[in-house]
Each structure stands twice: as structure tokens, then as C-alpha cells.
Amino acid sequence: MKHRNIVIVLLLVVAVPVAALAAAPAGRQRTAIGKLTIVADSWAGPLQGPWTWAGDVTITAGGSTLTAGTVKIWLEKGGQRIQRMEASGGVRLTGTYTMAPAGSPPADWKVDASAQEATYDGGTQTAVMTGKVALQATNTSTGEVVTARAGKATYNGKAQQFRFEQSGEPVQVQWQEPPAKAAGQ
């Protein structure tokens, strides 16, 4: 059961959809694409795309937030879905996500993941984080913590498979049990 939870948390973190935010500070560009809100120092590109946001980029959707130095987005024909996204310059993904694995009650996980770069391909539903990938996910009910460190993390949404890799070094994954409950709790 623990191993299934670890796998589900790792899948969730790498597969999390691009994320959510509040109002843009004065002087910053704010753009909405579908259910995404993007705030950055600048936004440029041809009308049909691709578009590039640069300078303290924050993308929000739902309860998730993605931050990076630069983000480039290509939209599918019709402009309603992301065909491809590239983020670079200190990429960070945060949010709280609910999981309900088969046979287990739903659980909320607070997630914080970072990497130097990240890409997403909408056609293959593949997300890749590269360069000092670090992940921490905490079960908000039990206090269980999963951490992972790797050089690269890949998630294929269609196949629902993930892979953490580290060139020449082992991938590091740690599971911390929840704190023991005192008698009578």
C-alpha cells in the first residue's frame, strides 16, 4: 500500500497540469488562455504564436502554480489547448492535489517540485522536468512525506507511467512515515 501511494504521488507531481494565481501587480502583463492565468514582466510573439513570457513568470490554474524565468507556449489550432510548453530559469510547481487510489480513501497532498527546465507536449501528454529535479509531497492528513531527487523526471499521461533518471548517479527517493499517534488518539 505504501509503495502504491509513493507511485501515485510521484505520478501526480510530474503530471500536474500547468497551474493557478491571483491579480497581476502593477506594470506586469496578465494573460488568460483557457483556464490558465499567466503573469510576467513581458509577453511577445506573433499573433498566431508561439508566445513567450519572460521575467518572473507565474502561471496558475485551479489550485496549482508554476513559476519560471521564461515560458514559451504553442497552442493547438483553434487556440483552446496547449500543444507544447517550455519553461526555463528555475522552474517551480506548487499546489495541493487530491488523490483517491483504488481501495483507499481520498487524500490531499501538498506538493512542491522544482527543476531547471520543464516541457509539456499536449499531443503525447508527456511532461519532462530536467536539471536538479527535486520533489516533496506531504499528505496533509497523515503527515507522510515523499521526497525525490533526480536529474530528469518524465511522466507519460496517456500510459500513466513515470520515470526518474540520474546520469551516472542513483535516483534518490525517501518515504517518511507519519508521526506516531499517542495512546488514546
Question: What residues fall within each predicted segment?
Answer:
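Mature-chain termini and adjacent capping regions
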Residues: 1-185
